[in-house]
């Protein structure tokens, strides 16, 4: 019996020595190479890292250094200087579901070709990371990203998952060709619905703040949005500039405020624009509104040969049409003032009062052609009540 007892003790000591040796070896470059090779050979993924660290002061955390991870034959999904993996008792029943995963100083590629990833976490934390998501609905590139996704449950075609809370900031970001800096985003992913509770960014030498919702069908609801001191030059015509609004099912605007904006494109420009828009929905080339309002003024507005100085416009929207409360502007050395209504039923513009003073205007050479040109689709007739 004593012999069996001593044998068991020796075996236990030997086992502990082997475990300790493995523990030490795994934290060497040789151990990192062996683990990387095993994952690459025996799974559909490629993994490489230089070193694994573990400290008894943080027994539930494993740190990998200089990590590259991705699917076989595909671009790497993850490149990071350091990956901190937080473990919990959940690994007993679900080994690939971590408590936390923290990525430091690297790049996370969100392309559908790199998904799905085989692991999940209660929280994915990013520190000074870069995002890339080419060839997706949201063509995104971001640098110096810090923030978190909770929970993180990546799926095929959606590396962030379908249900998560998001809090992120980025030093710079380009979304569908639009650049911004000092970006802050807080929101949720609910299936194909995206809730943006807080949006903040510096863009076009100005700033943007607001909150919005993207529905599953691709339509947008803007609760609030404010643009301050935007300075934007575009190579697009005015029609092409607003063309993206026609590509989505609908855009519902609760409140939009623009302050001191300067916009310019080929053959059009507006300077010192102040705009306030309430309760308007754009859909399929038309609009709907219930108690909507528009107030707008600028120092200068140019569209083709039309050149207005100090234009002021105030209007109200309803299901019946638009009530033009005020339009005044300096034009061609004179002053123009009018008010009236545009009626949806019949597409008729009825101007209650039109006043023109001090006008010095020379008709263009093609004025007859312009006079005979058909009216736009939204206008069938014009009536002047008083001139």
Task: Give the predicted meaning of each segment.
Residues 42, 46-51, 143-155, 180-186, ...:
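Short small/polar-residue motifs
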Residues 19-112, 175-180:
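Terminal hydrophobic membrane-targeting helix
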Residues 61, 66-68, 123-130, 160-189, ...:
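Small-residue helix/turn framework positions
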Residues 6-10, 22-24, 57-58, 155-158, ...:
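Short hydrophobic/aromatic-rich motifs at helix boundaries and adjacent loops
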Residues 45, 74-76, 136, 204-206, ...:
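Short acidic/polar mixed-charge low-complexity motifs
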Residues 1-17:
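N-terminal Sec-pathway targeting helices
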Residues 66-159, 215-251, 263-279, 363-376:
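Secondary-structure transition motifs
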Residues 56, 87-91, 153, 212-216, ...:
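Short, low-complexity Ser/Thr-rich regulatory SLiMs
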